[in-house]
């Protein structure tokens, strides 16, 4: 195989159909747009959800609820991600420094991923699931909570 012998597969570059070029082309006169109507005119852009003047579905359905702008995001960290660290104090700053969570996160919960770890961890001021609490305390680690 040489560079000068390379060529695209046949029919891989389909030529666009030229419209408005006579009756024999099959796309002459109206250019495949049919006769009259809004869609046959130039510059036809009908917005999404437009139902021809009928009250659209998204306005017929009642509104409910809202999205709170004050909501604090709680990031989840799997216990399996912490198995590389041993005898470490794991807190919010440590997780940000190691890149396990983003810098704008304020709350973290450590969840179980099914695997059992054997290294000793000290978890400080983080939310922890019940199964993770059991795993860490059985492996000799500690969970220190806010006072």
From Swiss-Prot:
GO terms for cellular component: cytosolic large ribosomal subunit. GO terms for molecular function: rRNA binding; structural constituent of ribosome. Residues 11-20, 32-47 have a biased composition (Basic residues). The keyword RNA-binding applies. It comes from the Bacteria. GO terms for biological process: translation. Residues 1-10 have a biased composition (Polar residues). Keywords: Ribonucleoprotein, Ribosomal protein, RNA-binding, rRNA-binding. Residues 21-31 have a biased composition (Gly residues). The keyword Ribonucleoprotein applies. Disulfide bonds: none annotated. Residues 1-48 are annotated as: Disordered. NCBIfam families: rplO_bact. Binds to the 23S rRNA. Belongs to the universal ribosomal protein uL15 family. Part of the 50S ribosomal subunit. This is Large ribosomal subunit protein uL15.
